[in-house]
Amino acid sequence: RIMINSGETIDFSGLNSFVADKHSTGGVGDKVSIILGPILASLGIAVPMLAGRSLGHTGGTIDKLETIPGFNTNLTIADFKNNVERSGVCIMSQTESICPADKKIYALRDITGTIDSIPLICGSIMSKKISEGIDGLVLDIKIGNGAFMRSLSQGKKLGTMLKLSTETIYQAIQQSLHTTISTRQSRKGEISS
């Protein structure tokens, strides 16, 4: 609550639609947020996404988007709200005015070896998402090599600490990567069944 109250909150109650965000705990090759936001918006769901930069070895959603020339993720709250109202989806980077306490802690986690601290992860995720004024949240907890949650038990612990009542699908991050690579190679005729 202290991190939420350290800055402004956003009010989307004037929208005539369900307001949801998607957050990932991060992992190598994670691009789900970039794809899922527009899909949900096409279904009439308003999707304000307050996304993060890299922590540790993974690139954050904002880092990926900023590789596109001219793509602006540094928006005012008013511009953010206008974009969501106009197009149904908007992704912006964390600002000085939304959860500034979290922004400072987030930067410190990267240099203090506390990136994988589950209580700090919970506080960081939920303070930003509550500040967005959303009705629902899709939380993508990545597990396995290349993710912050190395094991299924760590992923479950994070979900439990977030007090999520969820429908859960567990799949290790390296499994989907292997399946994708195998499928591509099979199409090229490089792997036989």
Model-derived regions: residue spans:
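Acidic, glycine/proline-rich low-complexity segments that act as flexible tails and inter-domain linkers
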Residues: R1-V28
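Flexible, glycine/charged-enriched surface loops at secondary-structure junctions
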Residues: T9, S13, L137, T168-T179
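Glycine/serine-rich anion-binding loops at beta->alpha junctions
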Residues: F18-H57
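Divalent-metal (Mg2+/Mn2+/Ca2+)-assisted nucleotide/phosphate chemistry catalytic cores
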Residues: P69, K81-K157
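A glycine-rich helix N-cap at a beta->alpha junction
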Residues: K64-C90, M161-I169
